[in-house]
From Swiss-Prot:
GO terms for molecular function: chromatin binding; DNA binding; DNA-binding transcription factor activity, RNA polymerase II-specific; RNA polymerase II transcription regulatory region sequence-specific DNA binding; sequence-specific double-stranded DNA binding. Belongs to the distal-less homeobox family. One of its GO terms (cellular component) is nucleus. This is Homeobox protein DLX-1. The homeobox DNA-binding domain is necessary for its nuclear localization, transcriptional and erythroid differentiation activities. It comes from Rattus norvegicus (Rat). The keyword Nucleus applies. Interacts with SMAD4 (via homeobox DNA-binding domain). Interacts (via homeobox DNA-binding domain) with POU4F2; this interaction suppresses DLX1-mediated transcriptional activity in postnatal retina and enhances retinal ganglion cell (RGC) differentiation. Its main location: nucleus. It is found in: Nucleus. It comes from the Eukaryota. One of its GO terms (biological process) is subpallium development.
Length: 44
């Protein structure tokens, strides 16, 4: 579970980073912060 969560978090970070780079907007960081918790809730 730990490894899966870590992988999911890494994937989410990569996606968030890609979106942030593409969007280049300030409202992106907040979303990135909200993504990890959502992923964890779904994984659990």
């Amino acid at each position: 579970k730990l490894m899966k969560q870590g992988g999911a978090a890494l994937e989410g970070s990569a996606l968030a980073n890609g979106r942030a780079l593409s969007a280049g907007s300030p409202p992106v960081p907040p979303g990135w912060n909200r993504i990890p918790p959502l992923g964890r809730a779904q994984e659990e």
